[in-house]
Amino acid sequence: MSRVCELSGKAPMTGNTVSHANNKSRRRFLPNLNDVTLISDVLGQSFKLRISAAALRTVDHRGGLDAFLAKAKDDELSVKARAIKKEIEKAQATAA
């Protein structure tokens, strides 16, 4: 299981832990990933995704999974999220 957010593309970063004496040692900054179930209003279906806490706040801010995916760039999304986005767009096109 990779440590990459499926919606925002956040991945581990590297840097230094710096002590009070300014000694530096290498470390990894891992994203705060959570396994969540998000519901699509258009499809009436739930999806299990592994997303960061920041992405979850953004989903809430934009008004749900459908609105988030409509605004999201395809290159930031995982393959699974891109498939969900395509399903939602197809369902909205047939409903309109």
Curated annotation (Swiss-Prot):
Task: Please give the superkingdom of this protein's source.
Answer: Bacteria
One annotated GO molecular function is: structural constituent of ribosome
- The positions making up the signal sequence are none
Q: Which GO terms describe its biological process?
A: translation
Keyword annotations for this protein? Answer: Ribonucleoprotein, Ribosomal protein
Q: Which Pfam families match?
A: Ribosomal_L28
Disulfide pairings: none
Q: Which residues cross the membrane?
A: none
The reply to whether Kinase figures as a keyword in the UniProt entry is: no
Gene3D superfamilies assigned to the protein according to its UniProt record, in alphabetical order:
Ribosomal protein L28/L24
The UniProt entry, under InterPro entries, shows: Ribosomal_bL28, Ribosomal_bL28/bL31-like_sf, Ribosomal_bL28_bact-type, Ribosomal_bL28_sf
Gene Ontology cellular component annotations, sorted alphabetically: cytosolic large ribosomal subunit
Q: What are the boundaries of the region Disordered? A: 1-23
Instruction: Read off the SUPFAM superfamilies from this record.
Output: L28p-like
Record family assignment: Belongs to the bacterial ribosomal protein bL28 family.
Identification of the protein by name: Large ribosomal subunit protein bL28
Q: Which gene is annotated as encoding this protein in its UniProt record?
A: rpmB
